[in-house]
Structure formats: structure tokens, C-alpha cells
Amino acid sequence: MKHFFLILFGISSPFICLATSVEFNVTKGIKASITWVDNKKVEYEITGSDRVAKRGYYDVDTENNIHVKYGDYNFDGKEDFVIWYTDDGMGIYDIYRVFLYSEKMADFKEIKPSCGDDFINLNLNKKKRELISLYYSHNEAQRCITNV
């Protein structure tokens, strides 16, 4: 009976948390490490020349799993990143938050779409340097183009 209680407690313990992380080179000599825990907060650290340059975090308000991808989202040759998750409603849209690396600030800066509140189902048009997403106006899906 003791072993059963220990196994049951170990499985259902509220103190278990899952952390996931990704590391990437932002540009030559600059690295970023991004960690997300329990779908509530994304923490990041930027390092250069073997020292920490910046640390920060972003709160995320979702009940769904958080995903992080890195890539060049403003087409400047430096790696940026996005946080994305499925919407909390019917779960049919992906919500993206876009963070661009600013060499001037030596930090990531969140950008917003040109229309609507969020980047929904984000796509990139590298040729035209556009971020393409959806937004809703009067309950109708519209195409939003954000130039970067």
C-alpha cells in the first residue's frame, strides 16, 4: 500500500513542471537561449563574447501548449523568434507573437500586426518582405499584410 501511494503521488503531484528550451545564433558572436515553462512565461537570455548581454521574459496568456520557432522574420539576416500557440476557443487558429532582434538595443522587441490584435496563422512572403496573417473585421476573416 505504501508503494501504491508513492507512485500515485508521484504521478499526480502539482509540483511537476515541464521546461522546454531552444538555443540559436542571432548573428555572428551573439547567441540566444529561450526557455518556456508551464505555458505561462517565456524567458530569454542573449549572450555575446561569453557574457550575458540581456535577460528578459514575456508573459503568455493561454491554456494551450506554447511553441517557439526562430528564423529571420524581418528579412535582415539576423535570427528572430516567434512564440505561437493554438487559440483557446475552438482551437482552429494559431496565434503568433513576433520578436525581432534589434542590434541597436541588443535585445528582442515585440512587433504587432498592421491590422488586428494578433498575428493569426502567420505566413512569410520573403520576396516582398511581408508578414501575412488573418484578422477579423465584422466577423469576417480579412488578410493583413505587415511590412517589415
Predicted regions: what they are:
Residues 3-12, 16-38, 121-148:
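Acidic, small-residue rich beta-repeat scaffolds with periodic aromatic anchors
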Residues 17-71:
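Terminal domain-start segments
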